Regions:
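Terminal, regulation- and interaction-focused segments at domain boundaries
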Residues: 1-27, 126
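Short amphipathic alpha-helical/adjacent loop interface patches that line ligand
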Residues: 17, 59, 118-121
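Short glycine-/small-residue-rich flexible loop motifs, especially phosphate/cofactor-binding loops
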Residues: 21, 38-39, 122
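Well-ordered alpha/beta subsegment
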Residues: 104-129
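Beta-strand/loop substructures that line and gate deep hydrophobic ligand-binding cavities in soluble
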Residues: 80-107
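Compact, glycine-rich, soluble single-domain proteins
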Residues: 30, 36-79
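Short secondary-structure transition/capping segments
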Residues: 24, 75-88, 125-129
Length: 129
């Protein structure tokens, strides 16, 4: 499945966690939610899962623009960035395809915002070497 833009890095998980937050901030996104899947699965299900985080990222200017066009679009927010540690200790980083998600609205102005979001998320992810 292709839910968004993805890349792999050999950087350690904790380093990726730190760098992706900084990189998202540089392109105008703040982190408004965070889920530590490994911790949550251990606490709730007593399952040992690989290291995996979900960051809910929001660009306030683009969110404001989208909500002014269609208030219901808030159900599609925030933009999720996920990263997980693979068996070989590499880390995969993936950002939602906002254009694809917003194409369901059939509203050209929202689709354009999705394109802008994708460009910024790709820039943030590509900054992780």
């Amino acid at each position: 499945m292709n839910y968004g833009y993805q890349k792999k890095t050999t950087l350690p998980f904790d380093k990726v966690d730190n760098l992706i937050r900084k990189s998202l901030s540089k392109v105008g996104f703040g982190i408004i939610s965070e889920i530590d899947i490994q911790k949550t699965f251990k606490e709730k299900l007593d399952i040992n899962y690989n290291r995996y985080k979900v960051l809910g990222a929001c660009n306030p200017a683009l969110a404001n623009e989208a909500l002014n066009i269609e208030p219901e679009v808030g159900m599609l927010m925030p933009c999720n960035i996920v990263f997980w540690e693979n068996k070989d200790k590499s880390v995969t980083i993936s950002g939602i395809d906002a254009e694809k998600q917003l194409s369901n609205t059939n509203h050209n102005d929202l689709i354009k915002i999705g394109q802008d979001v994708n460009k910024l998320l790709k820039e943030a992810i590509d900054a992780i070497k």
